[in-house]
Amino acid sequence: MGAPMNPEFQLEGRAPGSLAGARIVVAMSGGVDSSVVAALAAASGAETIGVTLQLYDHGAAVGRTGSCCAGQDIRDARAVADRLGIAHYVFDYESRFRDSVIADFADEYAAGRTPIPCVRCNQGVKFTDLFGIARDLGADCLATGHYVRRVVGAGGRAELHRAADPARDQSYFLFATTRDQLDYLRFPLGAMPKPRVREIAAELGLGVAAKPDSQDICFVPDGDYASIVKRLRPEAAEEGEIVGLDGRVLGRHRGLIHFTVGQRRGIEIGGSPEPLYVVRLEPETKRLVVGPRRALAVSAAMLDDVNWIGEGYEGPLTAKVRSLAKPVPARFEDGAVRFDQPEYGVAPGQAAVLYAGDRVLGGGWIRATVPAELAVAA
């Protein structure tokens, strides 16, 4: 059974369903999602080329699967390409990935912020370097396995929308995608539930049909991100004081890299009449400031490096400050997100992404927060 036709590959200037002579480059990670995208592209009638970036290979080192773009993943991608009868190329981007993603990850933690390396990777390696490769190969578009939707708006420009399957939506991680990139990108899985994607892979006899999903941070073995940061920025692992909101020393911590704003676990301080949470990190003094939950309330988040793809929109919007958080009503004014109601656990280094319904309007990196005026005892 062949792969179904997918309208996502429609190209401007071509009649619907007419892709003869077109060329599509597919970003293939070796997982089931990108493999099905390659199958859908091949079924469209366009010449399809699979491209895999060798980014980081710790899979062999930790003896398990689930690490993105590792050696086994490259072999899986090549096997899928062979079965589909499409060309497949591998490019070594380990050095670039190390410098632009891993080093930035360590720097952010050392500065007391909470980074999102997947956004940095999409922003740089995947949607900049991979774009260059696709254009050099003469592709009419670049297709990926992200669960988001590309919708052509009333003005004829592409918009970024949430995936149809909310449990799989990855729009938060793609807020930095530019207008020009959206014009070139295709996301064939945005309207599909994940079980259907696996069904297509099984129907086509792809060996990755039952392959587990990759972990979120591909270069962090077993989720121990602190060991990565400690190796690259050892000063971030130095012990320091735990202090209350009034500056009173309450105890010692084993390194700021083990904490993020809003965290409760691991503080290990007894005698407090109410639970204590991380309110902020002060890397200059190595102090961990803790307080009650109400001390986490913020009224606004100041953003850096804002990417806005909501030109012309002036209606109500919502903001999302963590990948798994629910969007909340907010306003966007002068580079700041101002929440209608106090928001909790907003960490510098994270992203604030703005939505109008399902449409992504843009977002930016949280530089600082403005405390809500709630009564907080010292």
Swiss-Prot record:
Keyword tags: ATP-binding, Cytoplasm, Disulfide bond, Nucleotide-binding, RNA-binding, Transferase, tRNA processing, tRNA-binding
InterPro entries on file: MnmA-like, MnmA-like_C, MnmA-like_central, MnmA-like_central_sf, Rossmann-like_a/b/a_fold
Active site annotation, chain numbering: 121, 218
GO cellular component: cytoplasm
NCBIfam families, A to Z: PRK00143.1, trmU
Family stated for the protein in its record: Belongs to the MnmA/TRMU family.
Name of the protein in its database record: tRNA-specific 2-thiouridylase MnmA
Species this protein is from: Rhizorhabdus wittichii (strain DSM 6014 / CCUG 31198 / JCM 15750 / NBRC 105917 / EY 4224 / RW1) (Sphingomonas wittichii)
Gene behind the chain: mnmA
